[in-house]
Amino acid sequence: MEYLKPPEFKLSEIYDKILMGITKKKEDDGTVYRLFDEYHKLLPCLLEAESDYYSFAEDNKLYLIEERSRMSQVIDSDDMKWLYTQKFLKTGRGFYDKLRARPKNSICPYCGKRDVYELDHYLSKSDYPQYAVTPANLIPCCHRCNHKKLSKKVHGISDLVLNPYFDDINTGQWLFCTFEVQ
């Protein structure tokens, strides 16, 4: 696995740009509207969640993060998915492309074989909506690795895959051997 430095930009630097152009969001049934103000009110919760993410990730304890934070009282996971797919991927496309371009030679850091094609939500946006647009939660990867991982539930440390931003496996010794001369 290729180690990548965590993104140089954080949510506070990109959130307003992602929100540009939001006036309302029409739900499927045509009756509920989400206004810009509702997304803007989320920012303090999302920034706190991002800070928690870094703290847990640096201690290799992302499995301890709560699935849904208190932000779910304000806005639901479908709204955060919408924010990612309709705004981050479109008005925030420059940030998406910067994240996608991070691996050396555009090779997937998970498998080291295929070209980076998309971003993986390390903690799924369905179970952890508070991290749907958190740059450190978005890992550049190939299509196959992203879909092989999918949104596996995290119940403990054994459920986590290596995180290219926080797990540098290239610095430790993994193979030990002893030679005896006869």
Protein language model regions, located:
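Short cysteine-rich loop/turn motifs with clustered Cys
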Residues: Y96-E118, C142
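N-terminal start-of-chain detector that recognizes signal peptides
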Residues: M80-K81, K90, Y110-G112, K148
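A sequence-composition feature that detects small, non-aromatic residues
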Residues: E48-S51, A57, A101, A132, ...
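Short Cys/His-rich Zn2+-coordinating modules
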Residues: T85-K98, D120-D127
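Glycine- and acidic-residue-rich phosphate-binding/metal-coordinating active-site segment common to enzymes
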Residues: D115-Q182
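Generic alpha-helix signal with a bias toward terminal, lower-confidence helices
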Residues: E13, E58, C108-C111, Y131-P135, ...
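N-terminal accessory alpha/beta regions
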Residues: E2-K90
